[in-house]
Amino acid sequence: MFEVVIGLEVHAQLNTKTKIFCSCATSFGEAPNTNVCPTCLALPGALPVLNEEAVKKAIAFGKAVNATINKKSVFNRKNYFYPDLPKAYQISQFDIPIVEKGELFINVKGENKRIGITRAHLEEDAGKNIHESNFSKVDLNRAGTPLLEIVSEPELRSSDEAVAYLKKLHSIIRFLDISDANMQEGSFRCDANVSIRPKGDTKLYTRVEIKNLNSFRFIQKAIEYEVKRQSEAWEDGTYEQEVVQETRLFDTTNLVTRSMRGKEEAAEYRYFPDPDLLPVLLKDEFLDIKIPELPDEKKVRFIDKLGIKESDAEVLISSLEMSRFFESLISQNLNPKLCVNWLNTELMGLLKGELTIENSPVDAQKLGVLIKRIEDGTISAKAAKDVLAFVFENTSVEIDEAIEKLGLKQVSDDSAIEAVIEQILNANADKVAEYKSGKDKLFGFFVGQTMKEGKGAFNPAKVNEILKTKLG
């Protein structure tokens, strides 16, 4: 039996307006090679100037994971040649990063586990190579975009733990609002270092790095395949030949990893302090950055202060957008538990395909009005589902307008309800007698008949109240 050893390196693209060492924009999707300048292009004489906002965002992350924030950190040159790296070196941090010795906690199958964060350092992103059939193109728009590289301790023991760690990290980064962490656009990328060892052994065996994984599903599949490949090689006696220190890519079509190149050691990058950049010396006020409420803190508040079930609270903190939507709902002085039901169950049940809470056709304000109409008795909860479905498809229609159009406004007029109840009681005199002789369950029959005659428009609370009076 083998134990799996996994360490993860995450590159989070920081959402600064400009690049880390120049004033070029960081916007995604621009025409190739338009967000560039002499610094991005590594033209002679162009010097880097550090972006202060990138430093602040790195500090915010450090505080969120209970890390040590170094008052002095150093930028180094990481030397390697690749077409999308104009300087033939990357400005990064090596032995003195801005953040180190952090932690976060994951929950897998009901068990909490602490995962150490070795370090988080600032660096610049490379450009992008676009490979055609007979040639390759280079787009340097991304070159110089600020990255925060977050390195975990090799303490993850399964693909499930790795995904739980990444989801937690992704959530923290989004709630801090330091990155949009959009995996499809490459602003949250992961490299997984995977090795195996016999259970009980403490030695670290040959690790394989799987590069640029950009979805939770692919991360899980890549790790599972790599563990299977290494385990089979060990059992076949070919481990030393098959498992070498290398970088592998994940084939998303066939769900296998393939060899890309040999894995470099740190010495091969010839790190040395960048002579164009002074060490970063942080004043105390930099360390006093206030960070927003994080997912775990929100969850505790939702449970303790609002009386929400833990399972519902988990859904509410599953994304920054979901959390903001809920906070916007309860800010309208609505019942929190009613808000949870209409958000987590009813609205989320309608969001399919490309629709998410972020681009929901029904916003928090509109859903809030619907919940108010349930609370004030204008419509029943059952009718409200029809109203929600209607405004979901007809986005220009407001809640009150939809209620009128659909004819779903509840009747709360006592005289109208009393007239119908009188008819039902007179038509069912035998059942009235049975009820009065002790058959209490017949009360539901009278309620049902009244609601049926009222075509669902009667206020159920009023119906119950009047029936109790009439039946004694």
From Swiss-Prot:
Enzyme Commission number(s) from the entry: 6.3.5.-
GO biological process: glutaminyl-tRNAGln biosynthesis via transamidation; translation
Keywords from the UniProt entry: ATP-binding, Ligase, Nucleotide-binding, Protein biosynthesis
Catalytically driven reaction(s): L-glutamyl-tRNA(Gln) + L-glutamine + ATP + H2O = L-glutaminyl-tRNA(Gln) + L-glutamate + ADP + phosphate + H(+); L-aspartyl-tRNA(Asn) + L-glutamine + ATP + H2O = L-asparaginyl-tRNA(Asn) + L-glutamate + ADP + phosphate + 2 H(+)
Enzyme class of the recorded protein, top EC level: ligase
InterPro entries, alphabetized: Asn/Gln-tRNA_amidoTrfase_suB/E (IPR017959), Asn/Gln-tRNA_Trfase_suB/E_cat (IPR006075), Asn/Gln_amidotransferase (IPR018027), Asn/Gln_tRNA_amidoTrase-B-like (IPR003789), GatB (IPR004413), GatB_C_1 (IPR042114), GatB_Yqey_C_2 (IPR023168), Gln-tRNA_amidoTrfase_suB_CS (IPR017958)
GO MF annotation terms: asparaginyl-tRNA synthase (glutamine-hydrolyzing) activity; ATP binding; glutaminyl-tRNA synthase (glutamine-hydrolyzing) activity
A Pfam family annotated for this UniProt entry: GatB_Yqey
Keyword Nucleotide-binding: yes
Family, similarity comment: Belongs to the GatB/GatE family. GatB subfamily.
Subunit (UniProt): Heterotrimer of A, B and C subunits.
Function comment: Allows the formation of correctly charged Asn-tRNA(Asn) or Gln-tRNA(Gln) through the transamidation of misacylated Asp-tRNA(Asn) or Glu-tRNA(Gln) in organisms which lack either or both of asparaginyl-tRNA or glutaminyl-tRNA synthetases. The reaction takes place in the presence of glutamine and ATP through an activated phospho-Asp-tRNA(Asn) or phospho-Glu-tRNA(Gln).
Protein name as it appears in the record: Aspartyl/glutamyl-tRNA(Asn/Gln) amidotransferase subunit B
